């Protein structure tokens, strides 16, 4: 008689326990155990419980290959969900096999778990295990299906595919309700307390292993509803017309002010702070160093001489590498939209900036169109106060549009959704890259589904607050993806290509490069452990299918993007995986977390403009300035969005935090510990530096970075 001792851990989440019958079957190289029910006195499998059981066999089973978990009806109780974290099996000789699960098991089904040792397909030779990999991926591909949102967009998850699966196909796929079509607007309606329509059906059905936890859902609602109702009760969400004075805008979120929001309110109109935001604001990726002026921006030395001073000139500063350009060309053909029944306007500015000898980045000249001429004056710091402020505000509006649509939603949310989908569809649970990437895909499918149901849907928040509306968003993102490259995606390459490696006080760059290096070192150790040679990379058919699917579905097979369609060496793997993890975590934090801080003072990030860009100088006053900014209700709706996306709901997992132990071998566990140690040192360095800054830069402090795109 051989006795196997099982230790079963149920997740600590709300409603994670089950009343259903749980049985197991152990499968080894020498046979399999009888199916045995796990039952003790009292309740089994309560949330957070760790319980021990024995499985008796007539003989030892050899090396354990699979553990089958059977979930079946118990008496008259309704079927429920069970979150199984892991099962540890102590064999008769005292050795321990770990079977990670970390998934919701719904309904009545059988789930097959493999030991936690990560294995590529090249390392599996037994037909039983090869068949298991094939069946697992086939089931996942039936559950997680691709869907086209709009031409030129990265493909997304089709929530229609979360349907009842046959019990013998349930590996991690346990949704039991058929979904309504995501594009069907029949459920697109207003809810009390929310200023926009919400596509309710698309929110109701989400595969349980990718949806928000109850804790996160409740936290999100508690962030959203009071803020929205508070503005509603004060009449702000319904008040149309211009703001009467600038100071009135401070009352929108009077109870949600931060140190940074106060700093922005005090310094927003200063040229130094305008330039600072290109380095450490929410869109720190726009600047390019230039050695000559583009023909479409005919700035002369005489125009900028008063700012440059007598000791230098424009040509000299160009040659020294001190002149930078922010070019919003992508907005030139963007369609515009009506808000409150009034036409809105968009500019496509060119903003020239200078790095002064004092190390400050300041604007030199602003042209509000891509076509120079008499109707497109070049605005200068020497112009009247209101002319210059209005020109800068137009640039800030362009910053808002490019940041929200491309830098933020396209390049983090949508691309990371494609990475998550390819990982779920092409890599089995036992694959080392699945184990590496899974924590960095947590909740991404859910948050993007929420975004499409509340922001991108017809009459959603994008239609309610932006000058380009939903159709303009589609144009911007499709155009942005068509020009997005692998160089843009990889932080060190992007900084080098933009010529911004030497700018002082560029905290996004400095912190980002440290985090990139820490991720790269971690990934290099993991890849080196599982992929010792070029051949081991090239022969991994699952890895190549994963890479090819990302290339086809995220980047639409565009060769000019420079993204890999297959991986040939461990070095190529390390770079690609490092970039994915960085963009799913640190890059998203950098472009998301500060939105309320920098946008709560509305003139610093207006979502729309009600007057066309000025064609002459000398006509702007305070009144015309206020009449150009968004109306009161538009401003409040947009600031509500800023507030929500900047408040990470509960159930957070900071970068490098891996409570789900998918890796069970000692080598990757040591690599994880080393990664966490590096991140802790980076955090200490950032906090020490911030003590000497007038405005601390905290968005890339590792404890404040979420592992994944989850809000």
From Swiss-Prot:
A GO MF label: hydroperoxy icosatetraenoate dehydratase activity
Cofactor(s) this protein cannot do without: Fe cation
Ranges of residues in domain PLAT: 2-119
Inhibition and activation profile: Lipoxygenase activity is activated by 13(S)-HPODE leading to an active free ferric enzyme. The lipoxygenase and hydroperoxide isomerase activities are in competition and are reciprocally regulated by oxygen. The oxygen reacts with an epoxyallylic radical intermediate leading to an epoxyallylic peroxyl radical, which, due to its limited reactivity within the enzyme active site, it dissociates and leaves the enzyme in the activated free ferric state.
GO terms under biological process: arachidonate metabolic process; ceramide biosynthetic process; establishment of skin barrier; fat cell differentiation; hepoxilin biosynthetic process; linoleic acid metabolic process; lipid oxidation; lipoxygenase pathway
Cofactor binding note from Swiss-Prot or TrEMBL: Binds 1 Fe cation per subunit.
Recorded consequence of changing residue 451 to G: Increases the O2-dependent dioxygenase activity
GO cellular component entries: cytosol; membrane
Pfam families for this protein: Lipoxygenase (PF00305), PLAT (PF01477)
First-listed, main subcellular location of the protein, grouped into a coarse class: cytoplasm
Domain Lipoxygenase positions: 120-711
Family assignment from sequence similarity: Belongs to the lipoxygenase family.
Disease: Ichthyosis, congenital, autosomal recessive 3: A form of autosomal recessive congenital ichthyosis, a disorder of keratinization with abnormal differentiation and desquamation of the epidermis, resulting in abnormal skin scaling over the whole body. The main skin phenotypes are lamellar ichthyosis (LI) and non-bullous congenital ichthyosiform erythroderma (NCIE), although phenotypic overlap within the same patient or among patients from the same family can occur.
UniProt-recorded name of the protein: Hydroperoxide isomerase ALOXE3
Species of the source: Homo sapiens (Human)
Gene that produces this protein: ALOXE3
């Amino acid at each position: 008689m051989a006795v196997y001792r099982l230790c079963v851990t149920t997740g600590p989440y709300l409603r994670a326990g089950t009343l259903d019958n749980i049985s197991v079957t152990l499968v080894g190289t020498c046979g399999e155990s009888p199916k045995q029910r796990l039952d003790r006195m009292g309740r089994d499998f309560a949330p957070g419980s760790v319980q021990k059981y024995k499985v008796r066999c007539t003989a030892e089973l050899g090396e354990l290959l699979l553990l089958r978990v059977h979930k079946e009806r118990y008496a008259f109780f309704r079927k429920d969900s069970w979150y199984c974290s892991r099962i540890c099996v102590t064999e008769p000789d005292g050795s321990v096999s770990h079977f990670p699960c970390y998934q919701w098991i719904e309904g009545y089904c059988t789930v097959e778990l493999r030991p936690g040792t990560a294995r590529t397909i090249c390392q599996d030779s037994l037909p039983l295990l090869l068949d298991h990999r094939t069946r697992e991926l086939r089931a996942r591909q039936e559950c997680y299906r691709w869907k086209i949102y709009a031409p030129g967009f990265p493909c997304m998850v089709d929530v229609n595919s979360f349907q009842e699966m046959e019990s013998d196909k349930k590996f991690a796929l346990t949704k039991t309700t058929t979904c309504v079509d995501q594009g069907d607007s029949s459920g697109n309606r207003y809810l009390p307390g929310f200023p926009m329509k919400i596509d309710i059906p698309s929110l109701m059905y989400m595969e349980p292993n990718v949806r928000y936890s109850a804790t996160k859902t409740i936290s999100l609602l508690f962030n959203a509803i009071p803020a929205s109702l508070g503005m509603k009760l004060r009449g702000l969400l319904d008040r149309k017309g211009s703001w009467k004075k600038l100071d009135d805008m401070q009352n929108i979120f009077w109870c949600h002010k931060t140190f940074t929001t106060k700093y922005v309110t005090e310094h927003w109109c200063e040229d130094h702070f305008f330039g600072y935001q290109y380095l450490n604001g929410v869109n720190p990726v726009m600047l390019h160093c230039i050695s000559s002026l583009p023909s479409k921006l005919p700035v002369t030395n005489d125009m900028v001489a008063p700012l440059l001073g007598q000791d230098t000139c424009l040509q000299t500063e160009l040659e020294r590498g001190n002149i930078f350009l922010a070019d919003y060309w992508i907005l030139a053909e963007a369609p515009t939209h009506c808000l409150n029944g009034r036409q809105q306007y968009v500019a496509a500015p060119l903003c020239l900036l200078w790095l002064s000898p004092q190390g400050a980045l300041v604007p030199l000249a602003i042209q509000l169109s891509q076509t120079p001429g008499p109707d497109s004056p070049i605005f200068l710091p020497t112009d009247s106060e209101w002319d210059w402020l209005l020109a800068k505000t137009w640039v800030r509006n362009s910053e808002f549009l490019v940041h929200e649509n491309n830098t933020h939603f396209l390049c983090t949310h949508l691309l990371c959704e494609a990475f998550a989908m390819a990982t779920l569809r092409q890599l089995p649970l036992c694959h080392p890259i699945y184990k590496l990437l899974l924590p960095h895909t947590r909740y991404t499918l859910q948050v993007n589904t929420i975004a499409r149901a509340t922001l991108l849907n017809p009459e959603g928040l994008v239609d309610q607050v932006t000058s380009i509306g939903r159709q303009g968003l589609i144009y911007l993102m499709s155009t942005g993806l068509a020009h997005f490259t692998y160089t843009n995606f990889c932080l060190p390459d992007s900084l080098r290509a933009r010529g911004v490696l030497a700018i002082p006080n560029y905290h996004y760059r400095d912190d980002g490069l440290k985090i990139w290096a820490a991720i790269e070192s971690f990934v290099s150790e993991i890849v080196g452990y599982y992929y010792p040679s070029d051949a081991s990379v090239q022969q991994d058919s699952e890895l190549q299918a994963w890479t090819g699917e990302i290339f086809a579905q995220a980047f639409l097979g565009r060769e000019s993007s420079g993204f890999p369609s297959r991986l040939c060496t461990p070095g190529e793997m390390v770079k690609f995986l490092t970039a994915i993890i960085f963009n799913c975590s640190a890059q998203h934090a950098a472009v998301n977390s500060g939105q309320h801080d920098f946008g709560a003072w509305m003139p610093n990030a207006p979502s729309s403009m009600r007057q066309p860009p000025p064609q002459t100088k000398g006509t702007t006053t305070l009144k015309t300035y206020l009449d150009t900014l968004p109306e009161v209700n538009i401003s409040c709706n947009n600031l509500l969005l800023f507030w929500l996306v900047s408040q990470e709901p509960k159930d957070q997992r900071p970068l490098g935090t891996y409570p789900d132990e998918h890796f069970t071998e000692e080598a990757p566990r040591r690599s994880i510990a080393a990664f966490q140690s590096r991140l802790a040192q980076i955090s200490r360095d950032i906090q020490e530096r911030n003590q000497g800054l007038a405005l601390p830069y905290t968005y890339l402090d590792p404890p404040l970075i979420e592992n994944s795109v989850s809000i």
